[in-house]
Amino acid sequence: MAKKVLIISSSPLKGGNSDLLCDEFMKGALEAGNEVEKIVLKDKTVHPCTGCSVCSMYGKPCPQKDDAAEIVEKMIAADVIVMATPVYFYTMCGQMKVMIDRCCARYTEITNKEFYFIIAAAENDKAMMERTIDGFRGFLDCLEGPQEKGTVYGIGAWTVSYTHLRAHETEADL
């Protein structure tokens, strides 16, 4: 049965290493017969959470007028969510963290999803990249029924669009 797959790419560079891995993931998901949409955060306007508590204290929609609400709506509708980030100082990039924070208003509706992570870093040691994965897992810990299905590690990706990007992925099938 086809799944609705949402890929969220937080690479600040079109064609950056994590973005290229998103495209490869997308290709495989489409070949498997899934419906796939890729959102590139750099092409969207997503402001940081202001901590106003309108959503958490009063149950009202976030008052900010940007693209975050639309992205969260797509996360709620998806069966599979792929979160992709370059690794900066052993953690996810700011664009991804801002998007995660903006899920606050509706995170209780992001339920029973399959999650994949894509990370690309200059680091050659996968163990050093685990802090980034831990950040994603912190988000998943707040959701109901998430299933972490796999991680694609783009290691040794120091330069933009590194042509010899070595991707190591866990066993994961969509």
Where are the regions a protein language model picked out?
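Helix-loop-strand module that forms the ligand-binding subsite of alpha/beta enzymes
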Residues: 63-143
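N-terminal beta1-alpha1 ligand-phosphate binding loop
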Residues: 3-32
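A charged, well-structured terminal subsegment
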Residues: 141-154
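Cysteine-cluster motifs in flexible loop/terminal segments that predominantly coordinate metals
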Residues: 45-69
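Conserved small/polar residues in nucleotide/adenosyl-binding loops
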Residues: 163-170
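Residue-level recognition of beta-strand->loop/alpha-helix junctions
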Residues: 9, 40, 152-153
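A short beta-strand-loop structural module common to alpha/beta enzyme folds
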Residues: 35-44
